[in-house]
Amino acid sequence: MNSYMTSSDFVEPRSELELNFSSWISENEINRFRDMTLDDNFMNLFFELPDTQKKQLCGRFLLENRKDNIVFIIENITHNNKNILNIILLALIEELEVDNEFDDLFILMINLGLDVTYNDNEAIVHASFFCKLSIITKLIEYGADIHVKNDLPLRLSVQKFEVFKFFVENGADIHVNNDYCIRAAAYLSNYDVMKYLIEFGCDPNIDNGYLLKTIVNSENVFGKMFVASMTQCLDYLFGLGVKADCLGIFELKNCIKKQNFLLLDVLTMNGVDFSVLNQLYENSEVDMCHEVKLINYLVSNGVNYESTVRLVISDMRSFQDNFINGQSPSFTICNTNYQ
């Protein structure tokens, strides 16, 4: 396993249908269906659409409160056509919560042969991705398996504590896939899920500081709410006795790149020694980087140190980003949004 998680390590496809990369239905095509009379021609054209486009069209009908269109499609499909019924169910999961409208359509499809376990329990996997607890419980009531694909619904729900807790209370394995859940919770800095898992027996010092390293190395560093959650997770782990000495030069460099003083303060207060970074530049055989040379040159020629740092590190970086990417950077060392 990697030294820390990336988004690709825990993001799973929400359904088999999402693996179909056929093009989305165009707005012109949606308009055409929207204006059509509900008749056999409508159904013939609907059946010709790829499955992904069928789901998208049904989703648009739901968003536009065109329930009659959905009812017409359901009532005019071949009895027990599990694939089409499943596609409509996936659209319902995305656009609705359990209410009278959902119940009416759901029961109508059940009466026509809807199988909530179709395609290896695709529906509950889809609902878990969207963390729709009311729909999840409805699917379980009609036979959906929460343990499908090695407790995939549990793994998909790490982002939302209420749904995650529901699966655990109903027998899902918190240690599945080499303690995947607590690793993903650390990547997301989900304090509630991480604390819950540790209280249920997960090791806070798994793989010699893996959780601490993952939080520090996480790509998700911007936004006041996330920063607060991240530091809360760090404080909790340090409070449990996880040692900061598991953080190496790689992690410390990442902390500095994040340009977040709150993160730096939490680490420093818990024993992290950033002076170890000096060893990166102690080898006299390694030539000084261009920026250091430029700073020394400008200071020796009368530019004060603060102005030099702002010019070289901030303004010139903006110039390079404009030149390469056509836009300025969102964050610079001299203008940190969350300190």
From Swiss-Prot:
SMART domains: ANK
Signal sequence segment: none
Ranges: ANK repeats: 119-146, 147-176, 178-206, 275-307
InterPro entries membership: Ankyrin_rpt, Ankyrin_rpt-contain_sf
Keywords assigned by UniProt, alphabetized: ANK repeat, Repeat
Keyword RNA-binding tagged: no
Name under which the protein is recorded: Putative ankyrin repeat protein L120
